[in-house]
Amino acid sequence: MIKADNALLLEEPLLRVPYEMLRKNLKTVHKHMTQESTMVEQTLSKLQQSTQHVAAEYGEKQQEEARESLDQLISRVRGLKRKIATLKDEQNETLTTTKARVEHLNVIFDNEKETDPEKQKETEKKWLRTRLERLLTDYFLRQGFSETAKSFAQNRGITSLVDVTILDQCISVETSLRQRHSTAECLAWCSENRSFLRKTRSSLEFEVRLQHYVELVKSGRVEDALKYCQRFLSKNADIHLREIQQAAGLLAFPPGTEGSPYKDLYACERWNQLSRKFVQTFADVHGLSDGSSLLYTLSTGLSVLKTHSCRNFGAPAELPITADKDEDMDPSLTSSARPYARRSENLPSVFGSGFSIRMYGSDEIRGLDTLPVIPPRALANLSSMRRDIAMQNNLDLEESIEDDNEESEERTSGDGERDSDGAVPVEELEELPDAPPELLSAEYLARRIEEATKENTDIIPKTTLDMFNHFYPGCCTSHQLSRADACPVCSVELNSLAENLPYAHHIRSHLDADPVVLPNSRIFGRAKLMEYSHKMMKAAPNTVVDPTSFECFKIDELITAYPS
């Protein structure tokens, strides 16, 4: 069961944002009331002094001035009333949002007091589902999918639990800076929040005005640039003197000057820097988290799963050799294995989770550069039994081999160089009789996919593992066993997110109760590995087969793994 106190650790922005809005609203009301009340008191004081004169001395001119002053006073008071009414509506809306969020968080506290286990479990499941929907909406907004986020929030009924309006405003200003290269919206926002920027000594407004000055110089409007500098930049000389001096140097080095020391000021990258600085400042003003709450929540879970056995995806476990010269390689490698060793650091895992080929229709296949090339050492362990299974599924391997041989002869030059796609000629694999050479060709696999999708558009494999399961039945892992290698920390999507997280310290595995390490550093559950090796691969009694690389190992070589 989820602990309420632990859940609140990640929910600070949920209440922080409406709190900051209420605080800002209160300060705005106080500011307007102070300004207008001072003006009203001064006007009434002047009128009172003027009416103390004798009626005879109080002529028509003085009476007209008094009436005008009263009209202006009434107009200002009415304007103040409209402002206060608008701010009151915003306050009521924020209070409603705050109430809904407090009730949402209070559900898990009330659930701890529930005595019925089934009802308690159902309530917790519903709350977690709502939290996931909140996190997804927040992620959509931060990625710029505003319409998707709004539709999703309305459909799920969680509009009051997400900051759609605030983040939409942030995205609007950020887009104007990064894409349209316009400073108008950002300067307007800086004007509204000038007190906060002054209090935190933020340089955002100066940086935006400096960029506007740079754009004036780039467009050749030198006189306008000088006037703009004197009006807006020079008053910050006590803090940003060095930046102002550099800006003045732009007048002597127009854009396009070769070897200009001011090329960084002219660079378009400054717009991206400004947009990032604005987003950071906007988050500080409204109490938003720096990044997506979804990523923070994922990081919390990944830190629990991350162990020292998790690998960096940039260095595939099955292709550890990255030597550049033949003499630096393992002498046991065959000549056909050496090209793979040199290319290993650029290749994905053979069945690496996360690598996918996106299908854009049955006649066009893109993304084939992500196809893995299976190393010959792994192919050498493919038994003839798997070839028989493939042939029973109407895969004419011999004809395919002949086609690949002809294509290799046409593409390969007389000196034996490899063709442009990096495929090794089939002639180099004569020493591997059990290795189906067509598996080495990305073109062959692409051709088989295209033929299959033309016949049946429902056959659209999404991953490399799906392709091999479809075209080479029996050659891949079972669904149950493949889950053991689908570590979230090692996946392509989450590997970079987990890179800087600390390692967890566990004494037992929650994925497999009996994890073992193979000599190639892969980890599987012993029972699943034994069942797969003997039932699927027909391995010898004292032998196991790696389901990802098809390498064979003796049972004595297995080492019991401990997660931490």
Swiss-Prot record:
Chain intervals for the UniProt region annotation (Disordered): 322-341, 396-422
Domain LisH per the UniProt entry, residue ranges: 128-160
Database matches in SMART domains: CRA, CTLH
Keywords attached to this entry: Cytoplasm, Metal-binding, Nucleus, Zinc, Zinc-finger
GO molecular function term, any single one: ubiquitin protein ligase activity
ZnF start-end (RING-Gid-type): 487-549
InterPro entries xref list: CRA_dom (IPR013144), CTLH/CRA (IPR024964), CTLH_C (IPR006595), Fyv10_fam (IPR045098), LisH (IPR006594), ZF_RING_GID (IPR044063)
Biased composition (Basic and acidic residues): 410-421
Composition-biased stretches (Acidic residues): 396-409
Domain CTLH: 166-224
Main localization (coarse): cytoplasm
Single GO biological process annotation from the record: proteasome-mediated ubiquitin-dependent protein catabolic process
Pfam families named in the record: CTLH (PF10607)
Subcellular location: Cytoplasm; Nucleus
A GO CC term assigned to this protein in UniProt: nucleus
PROSITE patterns associated with the record: CTLH, LISH, ZF_RING_GID
Its biological purpose: Involved in the proteasome-dependent degradation of fructose-1,6-bisphosphatase.
Similarity comment: family membership: Belongs to the FYV10 family.
Name of the protein: Protein FYV10
Top-level taxonomy: Eukaryota, Fungi, Dikarya, Ascomycota, Saccharomycotina
Recorded name of the encoding gene: FYV10
